[in-house]
Amino acid sequence: MAASSISSPWGKHVFKAILMVLVALILLHSALAQSRRDFAPPGQQKREAPVDVLTQIGRSVRGTLDAWIGPETMHLVSESSSQVLWAISSAISVAFFALSGIAAQLLNALGLAGDYLAQGLKLSPGQVQTFLLWGAGALVVYWLLSLLLGLVLALLGRILWGLKLVIFLAGFVALMRSVPDPSTRALLLLALLILYALLSRLTGSRASGAQLEAKVRGLERQVEELRWRQRRAAKGARSVEEE
């Protein structure tokens, strides 16, 4: 029971991490392809861009998903998401063009080169789509790095706890063997215990806070469930009294 309760959160985290890695690779692959088409100079748009590592990984992930889900289903999902993303990008592009015109008029009224300064706000739908894809990929990578960092810190916390216990036991044994005077032994043992308690407090404060927050959330769910049961019992009693 304990092993299953410990391994199930780790399994969920690993599954989420793998899923988010696949999503991040697909988004980065789409963003790379889109950015080459929209931000490349006019003379270089017709040339075939060199295939980099991210593009190769994205293609391999796409091939794996085609094998798992099916090419038709994957093509349907890709086309639907592309249409939705293109509609959103077109709306944002129209808004940026309108904002560019307003900013240009205001800057021209102030005596500045408004048309030149507001030129950067005129983004095509493809460019907006590229920004959205890269932004989504960056958010996914940030979430993935946060998850991996949390797992690494949790693992390091357990390793440090074991190392701290081993050092304390070694110091205790060395203290008992090397110090014959009982008073000096008691003082050194007290100092060792204080040091161990301080290290436990410093290393376990974050973990204890997270555990306390999880316990509070569990208690809140239990309270809500009890309230729901009380309301249901009260409604049942009222219906019985009415009958």
UniProtKB/Swiss-Prot annotation:
Residue numbers on the Lumenal membrane side: 34-83, 157-185
Membrane-spanning parts: 84-104, 136-156, 186-205
Gene Ontology BP annotations: cellular response to gamma radiation; intrinsic apoptotic signaling pathway in response to DNA damage by p53 class mediator; negative regulation of programmed cell death
Species: Homo sapiens (Human)
Quaternary structure and partners: Homooligomer. Interacts with CRYAB; in the cellular response to DNA damage.
Membrane-topology annotation of the record: Multi-pass membrane protein
Function: Functions as a voltage-gated monoatomic cation channel permeable to both potassium and calcium. Plays a role in the cellular response to DNA damage.
Location within or outside the cell: Nucleus outer membrane; Endoplasmic reticulum membrane; Sarcoplasmic reticulum membrane
Catalysed reaction, written as an equation: K(+)(in) = K(+)(out); Ca(2+)(in) = Ca(2+)(out)
One cellular-component annotation, GO: sarcoplasmic reticulum membrane
PANTHER family: TRANSMEMBRANE PROTEIN 109 (PTHR14550:SF2)
Gene: TMEM109
GO molecular function, one term: voltage-gated monoatomic cation channel activity
The keyword Transmembrane is annotated on this UniProt entry: yes
The protein's name: Voltage-gated monoatomic cation channel TMEM109
InterPro entries in alphabetical order: TMEM109
Signal peptide coordinates: 1-33
Cytoplasmic side: 105-135, 206-243
Keywords for the protein's UniProt record, in alphabetical order: Endoplasmic reticulum, Ion channel, Ion transport, Membrane, Nucleus, Sarcoplasmic reticulum, Signal, Transmembrane, Transmembrane helix, Transport, Voltage-gated channel
